[in-house]
Curated annotation (Swiss-Prot):
Protein name: Protein SlyX homolog
Family: Belongs to the SlyX family.
Residues annotated as signal peptide: none
The organism of origin for this protein: Shewanella woodyi (strain ATCC 51908 / MS32)
Classification via InterPro entries: SlyX
Regions crossing the membrane: none
One family name in Pfam for this protein: SlyX
């Protein structure tokens, strides 16, 4: 009977450790989710800024005439 009590106690300790680990991992997932949301917001802002930039008045490489020595 004492062996059964020891096994139950071991299982309870393992369960408590697993619950603690799950709580820690859950907090990490929440932090990473918040970080991802912030990065997505920053990316949307950056894309918006890039789209609003005036195009350059310089010709593209395909539009450039070759130098005279060609």
């Amino acid at each position: 009977m004492e062996q059964l009590a020891q096994r139950v106690e071991d299982l309870e300790m393992k369960l408590a450790f697993q619950e603690s680990t799950i709580d820690v991992l859950d907090q990490q997932v929440i932090k990473l989710n918040d970080l991802l949301a912030e990065q997505q917001h920053q990316l949307r802002v950056l894309i918006s800024k890039l789209q609003s930039v005036e195009p350059s008045n310089m010709a593209t490489q395909a539009e450039e005439t070759p130098p005279p020595h060609y």
